[in-house]
Amino acid sequence: MYAITIPEPGGPEALVWAEVPDPVPSEGEVLVEVAAAAVNRADVLQRQGFYNPPPGASPYPGLECSGRIAALGPGVSGWSVGDEVCALLSGGGYAEKVAVPIGQLLPVPDGVDLAAAAALPEVVCTVWSNVFMVSHLRPGETLLVHGGASGIGTMAIQLGKAIGAKVAVTAGGPDKLARCAELGADILIDYREQDFVDEVLKATDGVGADVILDIMGAKYLERNVRALAVNGRLAVIGLQGGAKGELNLGALLTKRAAVTATSLRGRPAAEKAAIVAAVREHVWPLIAGGRVRPVVDRTLPLSDAAEGHRVIEASTHVGKVLLTA
C-alpha cells in the first residue's frame, strides 16, 4: 500500500507519499481500507517532530479516518467485511489501509457520506469526553469555545446547543464568526478586536462561563479563570499559546473552579473504547437525526497531504480538512 511517511521532521514538504508494507490486524483489530482521513493539528506537530506516536502505534500520521472493513483479525465479532466505518486512531490514517482496534470503531452514521464521516471521530470524542464526561456541561449553562471555527470548535458549538447550553465562541474575523453563528453560537467574540473576558461577562450579566474548552493553554490561562463562573470548569485540550503560565490559585479557590488538561491519543485502549462507546450512545443519534453534522472545509487527495497541512497552519479553514485515498 501507499502512505504518507515522515522520513525527517520539517515543513509540509517533509510529508512523503511512499510505498510501505500493508498492516496486519492483530487480535481484536480489523483492517480498514481508508476512504478518507482528516487533518488535525496533532499531525502537524508530529510532522515537526514534537508529537511522536505512542508505543505500538503506526508511525504514519492520521488520528481519524473512514472507510470499509477489508479483513477481520483474530477474535473479532460484531463487525463484517464490507461494513462502512469511521475510526479513532493512534496513528496511521494517512494511508490506504490501517489496522484499528474494534473498541475504536464506529459505524458511519445514517445520512453521512462515507468520506465526510472521517471528520467525526477525533473531534466528537475530544469534545464529548472533555465537555460532557469530564466537565459535565448541563442544559442552561454557558459554554465558551476558543477556536470556534476549528474542527473541534464547530463540533463543540453543535453539541453544546444540542443539549440546551448557551454557546460563546472566539474566532478571528467576521467571516469565521458568521459560520459559527450558522451552527448556533449565541455569543460571537472576535479575539482580534475584543477581550473575551469582558464579552463573556457582559453577555452573562457578570456570571461568566460555566465550562470553557481551551486550545490555547498558557496564553489564555489567567483570562480563562477570570471568565469562569463560580463552580466553573476549564478544560485545556491544546497548547497553541504555550505550555507554561502563571496562575493565582486564589482565583480558583474563590470561584471553587476546576482546571483539567487532557489528551486523547496516548490514552489506554480501554479508555478510548469507553469514550467511543459513549459517543455512539449519545452523539450518533444526534447526527442521524440531523441535529449535529460534520463540517468539512475542503477535500484534497491523500497524496497531497502537504497542502492540507498548509491550510491548517494558515488557519484559513472552517471545520475539517479531509484527505481522500
Over which residues does each language-model region extend?
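C-terminal capping/lid region of NAD(P)-dependent oxidoreductase domains
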Residues: 4, 289-298, 306-325
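Glycine-rich beta-strand-centered segment in the early N-terminal region that forms part
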Residues: 21-38, 50-92
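NAD(P)H dinucleotide-binding glycine-rich loop of Rossmann-like/cofactor-binding domains
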Residues: 45, 78, 84-149
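Short glycine-centered segments of the SAM/dcSAM-binding site in methyltransferase folds
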Residues: 84, 142, 166, 232-233, ...
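Mid-domain Rossmann-like dinucleotide-binding core that forms the NAD(H)/NADP(H) cofactor-binding site
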Residues: 118-193
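NAD(P)H cofactor-binding loop motif with strongest signal on the N-terminal glycine-rich segment
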Residues: 148, 216, 239
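Glycine-rich phosphate-binding loop and adjacent beta-alpha segment
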Residues: 171, 219-291, 324-325
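Short amphipathic alpha-helix with an adjacent loop that forms part of the alpha/beta core around
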Residues: 196-206
